[in-house]
């Protein structure tokens, strides 16, 4: 039994707890997203629509967010691959690797960026750390001013680990997709034709 559990084994979460923490998450995401430099994001968005394929690479929850972004970019009509999938081809010159790491030091993500750079591909990165190895490899960097997952005593966020980074990463990638779509005359019905029909 954990300290959070009562003697009868039940955790006494009540509605007020949920209300308070919904407000916490909402406010932290809104405050942090407002601090992201929109010009950095615009540069990254322009990289996405340059000629070439788009590859995404991330670890853990950041990687899951990039998978969602990859889906939306596919709906938009781009050729998108997720690093590590069995059908993902080799990246090459002219392609874009979209990566995310809060610390900017995640070994597998940095290695992917190094490999892509050697192949002549462009790198676009999301991170909290502008001085990180990942940021140093990138042609376009978006700094998300959230706590790193190892910063357990941070005043930046009351949430656990890298939650705030991952939440804002999702919001920013959604804003990128929406902004790209806004600059087209493509109807939602056309995007819908690219949704998966094998489920």
From Swiss-Prot:
Coiled coil: none
Sequence positions that bind substrate: 62, 101-106
Catalytic activity: D-arabino-hex-3-ulose 6-phosphate = beta-D-fructose 6-phosphate
Domain of life per record: Bacteria
Metabolic or biological pathway: One-carbon metabolism; formaldehyde assimilation via RuMP pathway; D-fructose 6-phosphate from D-ribulose 5-phosphate and formaldehyde: step 2/2
UniProt-recorded Gene Ontology molecular function terms: 6-phospho-3-hexuloisomerase activity; carbohydrate derivative binding
Catalytic activity, EC: 5.3.1.27
Keyword Isomerase applies: yes
Triggers of expression: By methanol or methylamine.
Domain spans labelled SIS: 44-186
Cited PANTHER family: 3-HEXULOSE-6-PHOSPHATE ISOMERASE
Record-given protein name: 3-hexulose-6-phosphate isomerase
Species this protein is from: Mycobacterium gastri
